């Protein structure tokens, strides 16, 4: 019995997988791999060479999920698709081509250690056991039902390289039994226990930094997780870089401060708990592999020297977050959220400060009043100075899309493109606010960041200038990402809450829907429902929204790098008419109700009477939040009724201040 198979493979575990398929009698129609990266330290076998030696067609496409490649694979008519250490996720349309299923070999005991670099992460975390798992592939990475697992013991002497060898052997053993059983239809699949799932992101050379305030055991685990052939654990010594290749833990630190050299022979460094003996290492990236004592001599270390980085004993430097548009709805709430966390320092710029007055005295909040189109030198300096940049400046009120389309383009695209280019120039992480508007008139039930088409109307419908300006900038950022820009795009879905707008903005029509409706209630004018008010939206509480955004800034294990993330509440879907009816109900029950005129009723009007002829509306806009759940461990919790109540209360109290001001002037 044979089965036509398409394989996605890389690394020598990819080679082990291909060899196991051949040994088990599978007919491999094609193999997809990755081209060799000259910047990468290649210590593993070549999938391409193995395929060439066995007469198997091999390809290395930039994007195997491209429709052209999916069409070619469909013509192969595979029974199975296998993935062995292939680095990219395979799309659902591609996986669906396998008549009998698509399966992946993952280097951990799932559901633990899903994601990238599991062999390195288990060592970093001091695990004593790992393994390999063969599982069915589904849309979500590493989440499908388990077919087989092979356990691997981790010895204290193991490094990432030795553990990788063990995993390669375990993979061959597992596949030797599982693949024939699969051909014979003798496998059973066990769903993963999601309550035990953990997810880890990719590791970078910067993750190898030694922080001497940490326990020696933790540093020992880091050293063996990133030792050769990986870039190594490191710290600064004067103007030099000390790379540690081999180390061991010694009990006690002689009462010395973290980072203090206790002795040079052996080279022993005090840690936050116990001490670390450096057996071997090198000076700088191009240095020789040396013993610890010789390394100490080369670096000019003596007993009592203090390694740079020992200042980490006072705690790591705070992350500096630059928020442009800090006085806006998202900016002021996000600043408040970040300032509750000692790890962050916030720098902000905006043309006003009324919404952030409550934050101005905070010692970790630094504000300058200014315009992004004018204060370019200040902005460039602070992008260079800060770690994370959030350009939140935009025109985002629908009437302006038709009333001032060129101004929308100039601010939302041109000015923000300058900010993105500064981030590219200074290699800074940018978290950019895309918008749910980019999905336009998409007909999908749930709008998916990675799958849904972005559909807009004809050119004469100018309301789409905001959507396409944002979409174009999304695409520019994505292209810069391919050249090294660290970015995350987030798409808010109808966030609401206190300080959303000002009632004055609603008076000139330049506000969001709920503010306009509240103004109608406050002034005793009819609530206008455009085109019947049947358009549905998913309303998200600002507290839920900024919590998700704060987690993007946290970026645990770098899981948000290069991602697009919808942030919305699909359970809070309601029409604009339903929004107005709930507002009215809460308005009538509010303690301040008696201060305002009687309700003037609902009135149906054509949208073009308010927005102009260039307007088009969207019937529904519901997000898929699978990415947010998976990457951020985030689920919205605030019900729409509560959000409406909080928003209404804020604006009614603001309206009361307006009512009281004239009498105050007269009293003077």
From Swiss-Prot:
Q: What's the protein name?
A: Bifunctional polymyxin resistance protein ArnA
Q: Where is this site: Transition state stabilizer?
A: 104
Presence of keyword Acyltransferase:
no
What GO molecular function annotations does the UniProt record carry, in alphabetical order? Answer: carboxy-lyase activity; UDP-4-amino-4-deoxy-L-arabinose formyltransferase activity; UDP-glucuronate dehydrogenase activity
Q: Where is this site: Raises pKa of active site His?
A: 142
State the encoding gene. Answer: arnA
**What do we know about how this protein assembles, alone or with others?**
Homohexamer, formed by a dimer of trimers.
- What pathway is it annotated to? Nucleotide-sugar biosynthesis; UDP-4-deoxy-4-formamido-beta-L-arabinose biosynthesis; UDP-4-deoxy-4-formamido-beta-L-arabinose from UDP-alpha-D-glucuronate: step 1/3; Nucleotide-sugar biosynthesis; UDP-4-deoxy-4-formamido-beta-L-arabinose biosynthesis; UDP-4-deoxy-4-formamido-beta-L-arabinose from UDP-alpha-D-glucuronate: step 3/3; Bacterial outer membrane biogenesis; lipopolysaccharide biosynthesis
Q: Which family does it belong to?
A: In the N-terminal section; belongs to the Fmt family. UDP-L-Ara4N formyltransferase subfamily. In the C-terminal section; belongs to the NAD(P)-dependent epimerase/dehydratase family. UDP-glucuronic acid decarboxylase subfamily.
Residue numbers annotated as active site: 106 (proton donor), 437 (proton acceptor), 621 (proton donor)
- Keyword Ubl conjugation appears in the UniProt entry: no
Alphabetized UniProt keyword annotations: Antibiotic resistance, Lipid A biosynthesis, Lipid biosynthesis, Lipid metabolism, Lipopolysaccharide biosynthesis, Multifunctional enzyme, NAD, Oxidoreductase, Transferase
A Pfam match is Formyl_trans_C
């Amino acid at each position: 019995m044979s089965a036509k198979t398409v394989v996605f493979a890389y690394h020598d575990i990819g080679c082990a997988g291909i060899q196991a398929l051949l040994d088990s009698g599978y007919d491999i129609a094609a193999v997809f791999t990755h081209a060799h990266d000259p910047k990468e330290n290649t210590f593993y076998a070549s999938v391409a060479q193995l395929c060439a030696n066995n007469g198997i067609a091999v390809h290395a496409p930039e994007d195997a999920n491209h429709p052209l490649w999916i069409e070619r694979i469909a013509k192969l008519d595979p029974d199975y698709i296998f993935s062995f250490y292939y680095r990219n996720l395979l799309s659902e349309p591609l996986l669906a081509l396998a008549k009998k299923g698509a399966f992946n070999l993952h280097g951990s005991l799932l559901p633990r250690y899903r994601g990238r670099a599991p062999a390195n992460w288990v060592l970093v975390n001091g695990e004593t056991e790992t393994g390999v798992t063969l599982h069915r592939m589904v849309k979500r990475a590493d989440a499908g039902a388990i077919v087989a697992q092979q356990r691997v013991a981790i010895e204290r002497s193991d490094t990432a390289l030795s553990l990788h060898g063990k995993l390669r052997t375990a993979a061959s053993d597992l596949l030797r039994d599982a693949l024939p059983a699969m051909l014979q239809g003798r496998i059973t699949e066990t769903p993963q226990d999601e309550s035990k799932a953990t997810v880890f992101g990719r590791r970078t050379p910067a993750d190898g930094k030694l922080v001497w305030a940490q326990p020696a055991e933790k540093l020992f685990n880091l050293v063996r997780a990133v030792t050769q052939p990986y870039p190594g654990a490191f710290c600064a010594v004067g103007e030099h870089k000390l790379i540690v290749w081999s180390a061991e833990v010694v009990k006690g630190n002689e009462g010395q401060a973290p980072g203090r050299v206790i002795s040079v022979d052996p080279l022993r460094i005090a840690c936050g708990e116990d001490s670390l003996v450096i057996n071997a290492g090198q000076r700088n990236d191009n240095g020789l592999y040396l013993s610890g004592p010789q390394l100490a001599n080369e670096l000019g270390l003596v007993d009592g020297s203090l390694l740079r980085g020992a200042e980490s004993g006072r705690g790591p430097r705070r992350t500096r977050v630059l928020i442009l548009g800090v006085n806006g709805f998202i900016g002021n709430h996000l600043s408040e959220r970040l300032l509750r966390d000692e790890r962050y320092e916030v720098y902000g710029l905006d043309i006003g400060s009324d919404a952030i007055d409550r934050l101005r005295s905070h010692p970790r909040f630094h504000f300058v009043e200014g315009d992004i189109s004018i204060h370019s030198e200040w902005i460039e300096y602070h992008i260079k100075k800060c770690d994370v940049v959030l350009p939140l400046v935009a025109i985002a009120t629908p009437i302006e899309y038709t009333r001032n389309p060129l101004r929308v383009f100039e601010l939302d695209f041109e000015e923000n493109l300058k900010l993105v280019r500064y981030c590219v120039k200074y290699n800074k992480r940018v978290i950019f606010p895309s918008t749910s508007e980019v999905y336009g008139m998409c007909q999908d039930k749930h709008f998916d960041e990675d799958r849904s088409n972005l559909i807009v109307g004809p050119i004469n419908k100018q309301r789409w200038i905001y959507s396409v300006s944002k979409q174009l900038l999304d695409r520019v950022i994505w292209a810069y990402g391919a050249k090294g820009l660290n970015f995350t795009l987030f798409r808010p879905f109808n966030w609401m809450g206190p300080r959303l707008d000002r009632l004055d903005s609603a008076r000139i029509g330049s506000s969001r829907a709920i503010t306009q409706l509240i103004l109608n209630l406050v002034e005793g004018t009819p609530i206008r429902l455009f085109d019947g008010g049947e358009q549905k939206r998913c309303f998200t509480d600002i507290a839920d929204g900024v919590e998700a955004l704060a987690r993007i800034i946290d970026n645990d294990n770098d899981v948000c790098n290069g991602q697009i993330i919808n942030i919305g509440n699909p359970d809070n879907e309601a029409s604009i008419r339903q929004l107005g009816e709930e507002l009215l109900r809460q308005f009538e029950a509010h303690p301040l109700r008696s201060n305002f005129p009687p309700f003037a009723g609902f009135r149906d009007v054509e949208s073009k009477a308010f927005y102009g002829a260039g307007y088009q509306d969207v019937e529904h806009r519901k997000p898929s939040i699978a990415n947010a759940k998976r990457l951020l461990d985030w689920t919205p919790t605030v019900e729409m009724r509560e959000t409406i109540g909080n928003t209404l209360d804020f604006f009614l109290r603001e309206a009361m201040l307006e009512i009281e001001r004239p009498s105050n002037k007269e009293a003077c």
